[in-house]
Amino acid sequence: MVFDSEYDLGYPVYGAQFLSDGMLLVAGGGGVGVMIPNKLTALRVNFEKKKVLKRYREITLDSQDDSPSNLGVAQNMILMGCNEGYDKISSTGENHHIRKFVFENDHLKFIGAIDFDGSTDPEVYTKLICMSKDGTIAAIASSKLPTVIRIIDPIDLTEKYEIETGRDVRDIHFSPDGKLLVYITATSLEVVSVVTGRFLFRKTDFNKATDLARVKFINDDDFVLASGFKDKAGIALTTFRIRNTNPTILSSKKVFKDYKKITAMDVDPKGQLIALTTDDNSLALLSVKKLNVIKLFKQVHKDTITRVTVSPGGQYVATGSTDKTVHIFKISPDAMGGSNLWKSLLRFLFNVMKLAVVVIWAHLFYKYDLHHKLYDVTKVQLEKRSIEFPSFLDGILGTTTTRSTIIEGDIVSVVTDTAPALTSSVFSEDNKEYAKVEETTPSNSWSSVSESYWPSEVSNDIESVQENFDDIENKILENEDVVMKNDAIETEDESVGFDIDDTIKPIAPIDIDLELDDPLASTSVDTSEVLSSQVPVQLETLSGQSEIIDDKPEHLDEEVSEGFLGDHSKANLETEIENASTSISIEESTNSHSTFIESSSSLEEGRNTTSESSREISSETSIIKEDMLYPTENVSEQSATDKVNKNQSIDKIDVSSSSSIPTSSEGSSNSIVGDEAQMHISSLSSIETELSSSSIMINEESTIRNADSVVDENHSESKLPTEAKTSIVGSIDNENIDSTELNNLEEAVKTSSNESSLSQVTEELVKNNERVSNQSLSTVSTEHTEMKESSNLTEKKPESNSPESNLSESSLQTHDFSQISDTERNIVSSSAFVTDLPSEEASVNPGNTEGTIVNASLVDSQSSNSSVKTVETNVSQDEQTSQNETLSVGAATIDVIQGSYTSVSDSLDGMNNEEVGNKVHIEDVSNTLEIDSSASALSEQGDNQFSDSTPEVVNVINEFTTTPENETSSPLASSSTTFMTESPSPIAVANEVIENIQQDEQVAQQMEDTNSGSSNFQDTQHNVINDEL
């Protein structure tokens, strides 16, 4: 759409150019001596108002001056060509034909005038004026021939240089960047570099019939040339491109045939539109790209059109004419681009077609379920690709890559994990020890191993892990060796707490049920108690080589085991005493129950026993005496396993965190079994009967980790050992010795030199036994409380490593006789002696290579199911009574021999001649040592030795110390104690025993003097080794 408006200025227009899109500048006049004024006018253009063109600013020139002939405008600077009047030129001799104006603050201002030609001819005027777009340079040319083009500075109105053309120049124009200047003559075209002033391009080979009329730059490289024909009508347009001084013709076209001459031409700053006027006063709008006519306005003016100009925005085109009018046209973008209606219609139709195609495809997909089929195909292809083309990062990172494709709905995600996969290295040789501890004690430390397992790897390796734990569980149940023989064990404590009920993620270790194979029946133990859920344990790391450790830590606190006796009523206690004759066999199982391990300290600390320990010994002695005076009924022959299943039960154990465990591969925790009160009484009873038959010294000290077992009244909690000494139990059954042989033996003793003294001692012993039996029930009830209180005392290791200290550990352990009667001393003094054992056989826990002081109990043949029990008493004596007690022990030994023979004779009257095997059982986690001496062999030896005379009793001891044929090494065979086998007299035996006791007492006295400042005490510790009969 094109809108036009006409405005009558009142003077002929010779120059016109836009200052801006809304401001049009025109100039003209009547000339010298004419009543028509010469003016410079600024017109405001606004098609929104009724009056589109309005005279906005105007300057009237001197009436004596000539009319303006041309205008050049850029950046609000105005150069106008206008000659002065004839009179003024004649009088001054100068013609200031170039005048400068500026448009500032919406006002036109005159700046000055200059004469570049130096001509005084009033007929010579300024024909051409052109300014660069940026207003930095301008070019002017006069009507004088040949034409000289002057390059001037429009700011200070100075001339830079001149271009001699030698011809009549018809038109000039600057490129948009102001670097090139093109001008044409009637037959030639030339391009000049404004910077250097040199000619870049010249074209003179045009057709002779061509008449060049106008030239304008489209952009910095292209320009358009308008030409006519000399002898015929027609107008042609040609576009050129200048590249590297070699111009090329882009296009050329004859646009009009009827018009002969072009009067004016201009190109919009955007390079899209060409506006030209013809000799018939018409305006044509043409496309620069196609050189076709967009719009033709015929007969716009009544007279010749002198100027045509396009606004900077390209939306207005203005024409000026000598008819004193100005026409202005508003051109829409549709007009400049041709008919846009068809283009819009075509664009609309194309969009409709695209939409129709999309709708058709969507309908087909829905009808034939193609979207689901496409989804399935894509899923399969992605899965194949994930398998066939693994991640390229595998080779770069060098890691095990696990890829998984997850397709949920419309989302497809690929997860790549580069964590190392779970391998068997978790259970490698370096981690065997750790794994073995974890088998039985699944602590939270397992979480640290499990946290490194990725879920995808765990799912692949869960089966192998479960097989590993199955093997571990089988090893635990089969009680296989973990720490091999002669292996060294160095301990490093590490506290670990765990919950058995905890679930360890992502792999939970297989729970190991603590099932009891042979529960021991007890009237005072509640077998329904469950295993405590919280089991804090002290773990120890095993390493090193096995050897005897002579030095002991200087500051090592040990917890003392609490007593075995609980609170029992008198009726229950009587029942327990009756059942004391029945031997108790305790089968050790790694999963279900544990062994009592005796804990013994050094002899120096053993001597410092409090009065409470003495009272406990008195109570134990009373029980022993009562058991001797009132032996239990005979028990029918049956196997040890049947008796255990029938009569005993065991509590489940809760291990306290305050004790340290001797760690085996299965991680077995020791437990306290049975009714401690009943076992304690029956143990004391059997020891008294056995000691009255013979005294055996087992002098082997094999130190292991101390096992302090603490049992509360409900038997539900136990503390595992910290520094334990293992008891090795030996027993001899003299079951086939009849009463006749014992009577002969008694008569032989009575005929000795001390016959009268022995008879008196025997009578006194019988009386004391009757008295003690009445007190046994009352003393037993208080024993447990006293022993509990005394167990809180902590025991310290002797700081001295002198030979005396080492000797004291292997010397005889004695009771404190300061608070018991002479007869009681006689009985107690006949306790087991000490002998040395090889450490490899005596070691229950290879982690400890110290010697262990043990007792050997002789089991009476009446107690066919009696258990091998050990009661070790480390008792110290005061300095004030030590020497007197030594003499009492020596004198009492003779009394024991006579009294024990009498008691054994009485107790064997109603006994069945049962054959009971005696075993000395040393059970290690790594190996099991059994010393099994046949009861029948002992019976035959006993018949031969006791049938002749009394002195042969010594041979029974020698037979016991002889190594059985089926054993490679016996702990008794290495005894360092000398037994008198040649003397037929029991007096000589007694004297030898007294001498040994005195020597031990002297050594103990020396140690006591050295460590007289010690004030720590320790109670008697009672532990029982779980041996199998």
Swiss-Prot record:
The UniProt entry's coiled-coil ranges are none
Annotated SMART domains: WD40 (SM00320)
Its record classes its membrane topology as: Single-pass type II membrane protein
- Give the Lumenal membrane side ranges: 366-1029
Q: Which GO terms describe its cellular component?
A: endoplasmic reticulum membrane; Golgi membrane
According to the UniProt entry, its GO molecular function terms are: GTPase activator activity; guanyl-nucleotide exchange factor activity
> What is the recorded name of this protein?
Putative guanine nucleotide-exchange factor SED4
